[in-house]
Amino acid sequence: MKTPDQRPEDPEELVYADDAVVGRAFRFSAVALVVLILAGAGIYGLLKPRKAAIETQMTRLAAPVAAAMPAAPVPVARFTDITASAGITFRHENGAYGKKLLPETMGSGVAFLDFDSDGDPDLLFVNGTFWPGHAPAGAAPSTAALYRNDGQGKYTEVTRGSGLDVPLYGMGVAIGDYDNDGRPDVFLTTVGGGRLFHNEGDGRFADVTASAGVAGDPKDWSTAAAFFDLDNDGDLDLFVGNYVRWSPDIDAKVGYTIDGTHRAYGPPMNFEGAFPRLYRNDGSAGFTDISAASGVQVKNPSTGVPMSKTLGVAPMDVDGDGWTDLAVANDTVQNLLFRNHHDGTFEELGALSGFAFDSYGNVRGAMGIDACRFTQDGKIGFAIGNFANEMTALCVAQDTPGGGSHPLFADEAIAWGIGGPSRDPLKFGIFFFDYDLDGRPDLLSVNGHLEEEIGKIQNGQRYQQPAQLFWNAGDAGFSAVQPAQAGEDLFRPLVGRGSAYADVDGDGDLDVVFTQAMGAPLLLRNDQALGHHFIRLKLKGTRSNRDAIGARVKLTAGGKTQWRDVTSTRSYLSASELPVTFGLGALDRVGSVEITWPGGRTQTLTDVSVDRMTVVEEPQ
């Protein structure tokens, strides 16, 4: 009998005596494999009949070095649960009535956005609703919940009359000012397509889905979505990931059980995948669906079915050409990496780049994803939260001396100290953020299982699971943070799903929010008191998109360099704040800030004040 954690493609369980040693082996194996493939191509080129000699070039990869365990102590920086005191009363509704329909256990996302343009982050919780014909007697339909930040981290619910008080089986959220009017708009993914809400500027949102042309198909189960400027024309386009081909009837036919008797939530291998959608923003004319022509709809070459079961997406310029690419996290099919060809089309490079599979060549159950230039030399890393008994992936860009035709990545989770500790839990929301303001991005994972009764058949698993926080010690790797260092509230067991960050109380450090499936969210205030300095930057595009999504910011201070990329799309079905935060540690001044705006224009600042937010407008 297969349990929910024993997926057909799972490798046998291995016990590692030394994760760092194994990490080194994995990384060298990846390099060796690339070299063998290239060498094989060269041999074939020599033996193949030809009219003229062909010169074969081979890209040599620098040998990676496994990180040692951090010697520096993890700082004490506590998080405090302020959910109730902040005025948050939302509770997620999944409509479950005993039939175990898959959307019920997937939860929903959350977004920080400044919808009223008063300078502090408001909150939007995505919600499910009751299945048709199964609402409890007298129960009002559930909707998303909008909370206005009244300053100092106190919130007031303003959902009623906002236009977002519409019953939907909601999943995820993307935030972006698609019409460049200075107000953030909202796209909600749902079981049943997508919904676009235009921010009217008076606390109300108008449903413009039909006129904008972004509804998708009523049969779509849309999940992760992202606003980004695919063509560098100054307005935001929209990527919408879909999960699987699903309906209540299809779900009922799966007939999956957890113990041979009782029905359970069917694993995604039992459902056919679904293509994502890509919409080009054509200004006042609305959006144009370019999904098929753009190359983002990839078929399995053997079966012809969609090779997408998307739960996460991360926009990021992976090859440094000034055009935003897309990394897509898929559940039980290979992850996809789409390189932007500058003409409205994308090339899928997941397998070729080393991004698609784990170190054994297997697919994983990928959920949330985030991208960050987390090293001192600015290497891109993709953190991907995976299923239980699968490690969190940390796909790190590799040096390719002499150039190369495409980017290369290797999963270095074990070598960086993340792999082993992250293996057991079922990871959903995940993001990088510098919680202690020391100048190094840390990593937070929000966890929770799919099955309420999983502990009865797997002693090592629980439905409610604690979050995991990894402190970045620089080149020495990451250390798992303990409750004594970050507080008990952060590690309270939850049925965790979505997650996001923002500075909710204006003190400069980053606070976090988690969502639960069929439960209340958790809003955690960062109460670190380390005396570290910071700068916060809010970018405003003029020639580029108003949100400056796709901009890259490079900070130099004290002989060290940090990078941040502007996007709100992070984690699982969620959106974090747009302003970027740089921790400075004990430094109280900044050398320079270099901004590369979408499209490639650069701007350098040398007089940025510390310990405050600075608004930077793109030069005309």
Label the predicted regions.
Residues 158-178, 183, 189-230, 240-269, ...:
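Asp-box/WD-like beta-propeller blade repeats and closely related beta-sheet repeat scaffolds
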Residues 56-57, 126-141, 242-271, 445-463:
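Short, conserved, GDST-rich strand-edge loop motifs in beta-rich repeat architectures
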Residues 107-117, 148, 169-184, 196-198, ...:
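Beta-propeller blade termini
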Residues 4, 14-31, 36-53, 75-78, ...:
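Gly/Ser/Thr/Pro-enriched helix-cap/hinge segments flanking short amphipathic alpha-helices
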Residues 46-71:
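Ser/Thr/Pro/Gly-rich low-complexity linker/stalk segments immediately outside membranes or between
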Residues 143-150, 274-281, 339, 396-397, ...:
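Beta-propeller blade signature
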Residues 88-109, 162-174, 213-226, 271-272, ...:
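Repeat-based blade/solenoid architectures
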Residues 79, 120-127, 181-190, 238-242, ...:
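Hydrophobic beta-strand segments that make up the repeating blades of beta-propeller
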